[in-house]
Amino acid sequence: MKHLLNLLAAVALLIWGTHLVRTGILRVFGANLRQLISRSVSNRFTAVLSGMGVTAVVQSSTATALIVSSFVGQGLVGLPAALAVMLGADVGTSVMAVVFSLDLSWLSPLFIFVGVVLSISRKDTAVGRVGRVLIGLGLMLLALRLITESTTVLTQSPTVRTLLGALTSDLLLEIFTGAVLAVLAYSSLATVLLTATLAGSGGIPVDVALGLVVGANLGSGLLAVATTMRSNVQTRQVPLGNLFFKIMGVIIMTPLIGLWLKHVRPYVPDNASLVVLFHLAFNAVVGLVCIGLTGTVARAVQRLLPVADTQAAAGSRPRHLDPSALATPSLAISCAAREALHQADVVESMLLGLHQVIRTDDQKLAEDLRKLDDQVDELYSAIKYYMTKISREALN
């Protein structure tokens, strides 16, 4: 029981470390990363590269998906270019998984020590937030070492071996489990690193680990769809298109697991490296196959989620309250200010219409103005709720 609790604590530490890095990077460099994406979508190849770079820094393809989705929702980026960014984002998170699979545990004490010093001594500055990122990196490396130590002991238990053996006979169960873990951890990177560490320490068979990796990739696509479920139609189109790519990847790579073990395993004796390289291969293959399909998938998504059907209600919806900007308070406040201007435009329309109603006694226009009044109330509530979600600790 003690070793199981140690393992669960290490997994929680890994997830928390990933969260610290993601939020810290977005708070310090969020505006710069958004500018990088917006400037690099002129063609699909630079869009892929920008997605790789941003996700390698943020360590979360879901965060990149939220940023790109908000751009599409505001009409700043076309859907095909946004889908190309997401293909690069998935490759970027795979590259970071390869980096973290290396034995970098010796850097953990250094990162944590320097991070704590910077975070405490320069608390409300950008340097202090960089310290928060270093703490997150240190915790991730520490967690990976603790997971290795815990699983080495746990795998000696007959009960654990029996439970793990139940996974080896059902590939669909492995994919489902990996997807659920990615959604619960809010990070496919953390799930893949956990899986690779377990495989490297003998906690799970390698073929099971590869099935979990396939599921983790599918789970990251589902997570982005779920995160943007309440957003406008244009914003929801990007995660849905990326989910199509993930499903294609599952269809392509699942039958190749056996070939991977047969032809690659002799050259990569370390199981952890074998798992993260398969994760990289998964997203690289998806990127190469799907880079030419971004336009086709974009059209399919637009047919599934047509904008015209919801155009009538568009005026009452917030246009500028970007959820991905919440991690960067300065951007979030700018979004709220723009939405307040949108609200003011609606009020101006009401006042102009009021003069006409007084002069002409137009009952239909009067009814439209009553609806505009409801829109103003809805926008006010949305702005107020959005402002409450801005992280106070990131404000200075």
Located regions from the model:
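Alpha-helical transmembrane segments
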Residues: 3-15, 98, 134-138, 204-214, ...
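Membrane-embedded alpha-helical segments and adjacent helix-loop junctions characteristic
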Residues: 5-58, 62-67, 124-199, 267, ...
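C-terminal ends of transmembrane helices
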Residues: 18-27, 68-73, 114-128, 224-231
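Internal alpha-helical transmembrane segments of multi-pass membrane proteins, especially GPCRs
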Residues: 50, 84-87, 135, 177-180, ...
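Membrane-interfacial helix-loop connectors
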Residues: 55-58, 67-94, 98-107, 115-119, ...
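Cytosolic, long alpha-helical scaffolding segments
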Residues: 77, 103-104, 204, 230-236, ...
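Cytoplasmic-side transmembrane-helix entry/capping segments in multi-pass membrane proteins
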Residues: 81-87, 106-111, 128-139, 239-244
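Hydrophobic transmembrane alpha-helical segments of multi-pass transport and channel proteins
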Residues: 95, 217, 221-222, 243-252, ...
